[in-house]
Amino acid sequence: MENDKRTLVAGSTGSLGLNILKLLSQKGTPVRALIRSEDEKSKVTPYTDDVWIGDASKGVDDIENLTEGITTVISALGKSVSLFSPSEESFFETDYLANKAILDDAVKNGVKRFVYVSIKGADVEKDYSIAKAHKMFENELRASGLEYTILRPVGFFSGLNDLAILAKRKVIPVIGDGMAKTNSIHHEDLAAVVVSYHENGPDIIEVGGPLIHTRLEMAEMIKDKIGGQIVKIPETMAKIGAAIPKIFDEGMHDKLDYFAFITTNDMIGEKNGSISFNEYLSTLDLNELP
């Protein structure tokens, strides 16, 4: 296939990936979408008819020559950190092995550039499973010889949907004193940042949204929108609570452990976008939340 500066989008059926796909399509960029099943095809066909079906977490053989004819790979591929999104795959399988398989195929096929959406906290010293999987892939990407940009978003607004779901159940947990600050970002705004680095950009950038709030302020916004009671949970109790699921469900433990970390430490990145958390909350359809 002749190289026509085609871009591969991995993780193309998630909220971030779909917006990346949409923006690239609007720019007239030829795009290939990687999806995992035929059932997902209708999500991406409004933006491209170049669709590959494969599960990168199964290794290179399942996606062999996926990147043939590709100039740039954009990967928004990763496991959901939501407590209400169970998945059989581990963070190691989804965030590391799947991206590594795509990277190996990209190197083999002479891809020029790789843009990867990681997470803020990937470089923390403590051995969080979620952060570790991203960090392992970041290291692989750095050593690959490809041009790259690694984006570390501080968090998505949609990542706080768990609190909205709990608010429907009349409780909004806040770990610690709630004074840790963050400037989480809307997935549409983050997609625009990702696409802006499509052809070139910094090696690593930490990306946030337009406004900085404390965790308590965000909980109060959720309460104003949905109702519920804000309940402060001491950090020590949260750590004990996160450890208990490890006996039964390693993935749930990983999510709770990392949630406690990010909500008790400042998670602030370079300001981008225009959509506020209050605006995001106003668009939530509570009937669609479990």
Predicted features and spans:
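N-terminal Rossmann NAD(P)H-binding glycine-rich loop of SDR-like oxidoreductase domains
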Residues: 2-27
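Glycine-/Pro-rich loop/turn segments that contact NAD(P) or position catalytic residues
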Residues: 79, 83-168
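Terminal hydrophobic/aromatic helix or amphipathic segment near a protein terminus
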Residues: 217-263
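Amphipathic terminal alpha-helices
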Residues: 263-290
